[in-house]
Amino acid sequence: MITVNTLQKMKAAGEKIAMLTAYESSFAALMDDAGVDVLLVGDSLGMAVQGRQSTLPVSLRDMCYHTECVARGAKNAMIVSDLPFGAYQQSKEQAFAAAAELMAAGAHMVKLEGGVWMAETTEFLQMRGIPVCAHIGLTPQSVFAFGGYKVQGRGGKAQALLNDAKAHDDAGAAVVLMECVPAELAKKVTESVSCPTIGIGAGVDCDGQVLVMHDMLGIFPGKTAKFVKNFMQGQSSIQAAVRAYVAEVKAKTFPAAEHIFAD
């Protein structure tokens, strides 16, 4: 079974971590069998599964339900579950209560969004036995504050993002996830922190990659993001597509040049 120690050893050995979102047991079992290292029960289910316009309406009850479903299907992969909007920002104690519910539902780690200002919460959780994945850069729960889904950390804002990563690393984060960040900055962050980094639209030099399942299978309606690749193209089955994703992440051929953002 993949653990936080496994991920740390993978970073040290230069072995890339393959992560995908999963929301129910059958896909969790398929991905697990195909060699996916980490399954993310993401609040992206609000858009990918529930048909909402953002992740904000997703509830803790929703997250616990889908975490339970994924936990029934996965045998080897690590399960990371998102703390949903409004379930952890008010206080460290609120965050712990919500995280405890997700862990009881079958999560092995929880993910929270935010920079330096959330590092204290990261420390509070990890000191109480809950591993934390800190999501920085483009954080979808703050999409309305950002004014849309935009690349983060460009130009003069690069140092602030690096500070975010270091703050969470110092606080004991098990993983730092970067979304929509210039590739060179993501590389610098990865080299600057002791914990593994996972990228989505953050270049090939992160310690691992993640995509939303619906995106990598080409079944998400509407325009796809620059960092997305449809792995179903040329494949005969969903399992073959997932295996292709894992293989390309491990071989460092995904993401390619067309999937990354420059400064």
UniProtKB/Swiss-Prot annotation:
A GO cellular component term found in this entry reads: cytoplasm
Q: Where in the cell is it found?
A: Cytoplasm
The family line of this record is:
Belongs to the PanB family.
Q: What is this protein called?
A: 3-methyl-2-oxobutanoate hydroxymethyltransferase
What class does this enzyme belong to in the EC scheme?
A: transferase
Q: What does this protein do?
A: Catalyzes the reversible reaction in which hydroxymethyl group from 5,10-methylenetetrahydrofolate is transferred onto alpha-ketoisovalerate to form ketopantoate.
Alphabetized, the UniProt keywords read: Cytoplasm, Magnesium, Metal-binding, Pantothenate biosynthesis, Transferase
Q: Name one GO biological process term.
A: pantothenate biosynthetic process
Q: Which residues bind Mg(2+)?
A: D43, D82, E113
Reaction(s) this enzyme catalyzes, per UniProt? 3-methyl-2-oxobutanoate + (6R)-5,10-methylene-5,6,7,8-tetrahydrofolate + H2O = 2-dehydropantoate + (6S)-5,6,7,8-tetrahydrofolate
Q: Which GO terms describe its molecular function?
A: 3-methyl-2-oxobutanoate hydroxymethyltransferase activity; magnesium ion binding
Q: In which pathway does it act?
A: Cofactor biosynthesis; (R)-pantothenate biosynthesis; (R)-pantoate from 3-methyl-2-oxobutanoate: step 1/2
* Binding site residues for 3-methyl-2-oxobutanoate: D43, S44, D82, K111
Q: How does it assemble?
A: Homodecamer; pentamer of dimers.
Required co-factor(s) are: Mg(2+)
Q: What is its main location?
A: cytoplasm
Cofactor binding comment, as recorded:
Binds 1 Mg(2+) ion per subunit.
Q: What does the record give as the active site?
A: E179
Might you give the EC number(s) for this enzyme?
Answer: 2.1.2.11
Q: In which organism is this protein found?
A: Neisseria meningitidis serogroup A / serotype 4A (strain DSM 15465 / Z2491)
Return the Pfam families for the record. Pantoate_transf
Instruction: Kindly give the NCBIfam families that the UniProt entry links to this protein.
Output: panB, PRK00311.1
